[in-house]
C-alpha cells in the first residue's frame, strides 16, 4: 500500500512538472507576430482596394475599370461590362478576417473595440450593399444591389451566417444574432 501511494505521488509530481502549474496562458511571440501580420494585411487591403466614397472594395488592383476585362465570366456581356466593385465572395472575406482579429484580441479591450468598430462602420455597411430584397427569400447577392440582378449563391450566404453567428458569440450583441437568424430559418 505504501508503495502504491508513493508511486501515485511520484506520478502526480511528474505530471505537474511536465504540464506546469500556470493557469493563465501567456501570449506567444509567434501569436503576436501573426496578429501584426494579419493587421498589416487588412490595412493593406483597405489601402489598395477601397473604393473611394464607399465602404466597398475594388475587384482588382491597380483599379483600371475602363481597360479591365474579366476572363473568368461566363458570358461576353458580363466580360465586357467592368465591375466597379468586388463580388460578394472576396468582399465577404473581410468579414471573416475581421472576425478572426476580434477573436484574437478578445483579451485586449482597445484592439477588440477597434476591430468591432471596423466591422460595424466599414465591413457591415459594405456588406449591406449586396443584400437583395427584390427576391424572396431575402439573401446576399453575388454583386451589389444597385446593379442588375445577380446570382445568389447559398454557400456564400451560409458563410455569412457563420460569420454573424461567430461575432454574436464573441460579443453577445443582439444585432449580430438577428442577422445570423436570417440564414438559419
Give residue spans per PLM region.
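Low-complexity, Ser/Thr/Pro/Gly-enriched N-terminal "stalk/linker" regions
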Residues: 21-147, 174-185
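Mobile, glycine-rich extracellular loop/lid and propeptide segments
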Residues: 151-164, 179, 183
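Hydrophobic/aromatic-rich effector regions of fungal transcription factors
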Residues: 142-148, 159-169
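Functionally constrained cores in energy, signaling, and assembly domains
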Residues: 16-17, 94-95, 99, 151, ...
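Bacterial Sec-dependent N-terminal signal peptides
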Residues: 1-29
Amino acid at each position: 500500500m505504501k508503495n502504491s501511494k508513493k508511486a501515485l505521488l511520484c506520478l502526480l509530481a511528474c505530471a505537474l512538472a511536465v504540464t506546469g502549474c500556470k493557469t493563465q496562458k501567456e501570449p506567444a511571440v509567434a501569436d503576436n507576430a501573426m496578429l501584426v501580420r494579419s493587421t498589416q494585411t487588412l490595412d493593406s487591403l483597405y489601402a489598395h482596394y477601397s473604393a473611394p466614397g464607399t465602404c466597398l472594395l475594388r475587384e482588382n488592383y491597380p483599379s483600371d475599370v475602363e481597360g479591365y476585362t474579366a476572363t473568368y465570366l461566363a458570358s461576353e456581356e458580363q466580360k465586357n461590362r467592368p465591375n466597379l466593385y468586388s463580388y460578394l465572395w472576396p468582399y465577404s472575406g473581410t468579414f471573416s478576417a475581421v472576425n478572426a482579429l476580434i477573436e484574437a484580441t478578445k483579451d485586449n479591450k482597445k484592439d477588440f473595440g477597434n476591430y468591432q468598430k471596423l466591422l460595424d462602420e466599414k465591413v457591415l455597411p459594405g456588406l449591406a450593399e449586396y443584400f437583395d430584397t427584390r427576391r424572396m427569400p431575402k439573401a446576399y447577392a453575388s454583386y451589389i444591389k444597385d446593379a442588375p440582378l445577380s446570382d445568389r449563391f447559398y454557400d456564400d450566404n451560409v458563410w455569412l451566417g457563420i460569420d454573424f453567428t461567430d461575432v454574436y458569440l464573441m460579443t453577445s450583441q443582439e444585432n449580430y444574432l438577428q442577422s445570423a437568424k436570417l440564414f438559419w430559418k
